[in-house]
Regions:
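Short, low-complexity N-terminal leaders and the immediately following helix N-cap/first helix
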Residues: 3-87, 114, 334, 339-364, ...
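Helix-rich terminal scaffold detector
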Residues: 7-12, 16-19, 23, 187-314, ...
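Generic structural signal for well-ordered, non-membrane alpha-helical segments
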Residues: 19-23, 27, 40, 44, ...
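Flexible glycine/proline-rich
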Residues: 21, 39-49, 53-54, 100, ...
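Short, glycine/charged-enriched hinge/interface segments at domain edges or termini
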Residues: 21-23, 73-239, 382, 418-420, ...
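Generic secondary-structure signature for well-ordered alpha-helical cores
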Residues: 28-39, 53, 57, 148, ...
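Solvent-exposed alpha-helices and their adjacent loops that cap or buttress functional pockets
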Residues: 66-68, 83-86, 104-108, 121-123, ...
Length: 428
């Protein structure tokens, strides 16, 4: 793994040397280091949205017995095969059979058993006639229509046969998987653990949302945005609060989150006199992997490790922080939780306006995706400043402009990373 690591000379950084790697290279370095966490035993309801860490095989057939798919009458098909409305067949009803009970009687020629949905098929019967095709006459019933032989009977093992693998290790547990687990009698299952993610925002100018907003101060929105992004992934955020621009305060706050599986810092990662995060992390034993990424927004994104713990340093600007999280931290957390699909979907969309940029960095431009007659279109949200949080509120995707591209004209196709897709018909 060490061949992927690129250690940075912090003294050179302080002198102004800037080393940037590509987005793809940064992601490769991160994901080569990230490994799935261990697993834990949870109840099946607690498993919703989690990734299962074991194969599940059926211990028995489902359904375990042939049973009725309809309310109606269990009969011998030979008795009723010629039944019509004009020439109904009259049978003697020998029993009423609710679901959950097994009949001790046998259906003989000329007889029927009234049966409820889910009730086991009684001996002698080979077909169920639905109630709508009958006329009840007390202890007799008239059959007005002959269904096909074997109709309305669910066979034993029709859903699942004993020994079948019904859920595979690595599958995401949705409500339907939980229903299947319940039907198999599994009250508890093993799932991948959810990472604890420590989040620290730094800056003398920051105050919390419930504090007095004095002149020159700003509310630390990143504390909540990042925590929400972590929760949306299914991981567990640990908010360490706000640290002042002093190495001792930053180091003290970071040490409180050392038990976490992942550490995220926001701000204090650029090259400057008041950027103390890198020094505090170095004192905690972090090895730096990279310090700058050739992307916009999000250039001052860092990645390192403290032992086997990944450490991400994000920019302080709200949009830069969110975009960097989407590109690097979200797939990392999903991989740690055992997910097979760790990336947002990327679609082709037709651009509705010209986009210009300087070549050299990959741009992630906030966009609004629409679907018109099965074709995707995208337009920007407007001004793209890295502090304009409202642009992320408007956006449902990120327009990806490659490093070597300087102009994309309206009408051309472009790749767009889908952030929110409920109205687009895109699988996330």
């Amino acid at each position: 793994m060490k061949k992927f690591l690129c250690y940075i000379n912090i003294k050179n950084l302080k002198k102004g040397t800037i080393f940037m790697i590509s987005v793809d290279e940064a992601l490769e370095k991160i994901l080569s280091f990230i490994k799935p966490l261990g697993y834990e035993k949870v109840s099946i309801l607690e498993g919703l949205g989690r990734v299962i860490a074991e194969d599940i095989h059926a211990p028995r057939d489902i359904p375990p017995l042939d049973n009725s798919a309809m309310d109606g009458y269990a009969v011998k098909w030979d008795d009723i095969k010629n039944a019509t409305k004009d020439n109904p067949v009259r049978l003697k009803v020998i029993e009423d059979l609710p679901a959950g009970l097994i009949s001790k009687k046998t259906v003989e020629n000329g007889c029927a058993i009234r049966i409820m949905t889910g009730a086991p098929i009684p001996k002698g019967a080979d077909t169920v006639v639905q109630s709508e095709d009958t006329i009840s006459e007390g202890s007799f019933v008239q059959i007005l229509n002959a269904p096909p032989f074997g109709d309305n009977i669910r066979k034993a093992g029709e859903d699942v046969k004993r020994g079948d693998k019904v859920i595979s290790k690595g599958d995401l547990l949705r409500p339907q998987e939980l229903g299947m687990l319940a039907s198999l009698g599994r009250a508890f299952i093993y799932v991948y653990q959810r990472p604890l993610v420590a989040i620290l925002c730094t800056g003398d100018e920051l105050v919390d949302v419930d504090e007095n907003l004095e002149e020159g101060k700003i509310i630390s929105s990143n504390s909540y945005t990042l925590a929400a992004q972590v929760k949306e992934c299914g991981a567990i955020p640990i908010q360490l609060g706000i640290a002042k621009d002093r190495k001792e305060d930053i180091e003290n706050k970071l040490s409180q989150g050392i038990r976490a599986d992942v550490i995220i810092t926001s701000a204090g990662v650029s090259v400057g006199d008041y950027d103390f995060v890198k020094d505090a992390l170095k004192n905690l034993g972090m090895e730096m992997v990279f310090w700058k990424v050739a992307m916009k927004p999000g250039r001052p994104t860092t990645f390192g490790k403290i032992g086997e713990k990944p450490v991400f340093g994000l920019p302080g600007n709200p949009v830069s922080s969110m975009v960097s999280f989407e590109q690097f931290i979200r797939p990392s957390l999903l991989k740690m939780m055992g997910h097979k699909q760790i990336f947002r979907p990327i679609i082709d969309a037709i651009l509705k306006e010209d986009i210009k940029k300087k070549p050299g960095r990959r741009h992630f431009i906030r966009g609004i995706i629409t679907c018109e007659n099965g074709t995707y279109f995208v337009t920007t949200t407007g001004p793209q400043g890295s502090g304009i949080l409202r642009s992320m509120v408007k956006a449902n995707g990120l327009i990806i402009v490659p490093e070597d591209t300087s102009l994309i004209k309206a009408g051309e196709k472009i790749k767009v990373q889908v952030l929110y897709s409920s109205d687009l018909g895109v699988v996330r």
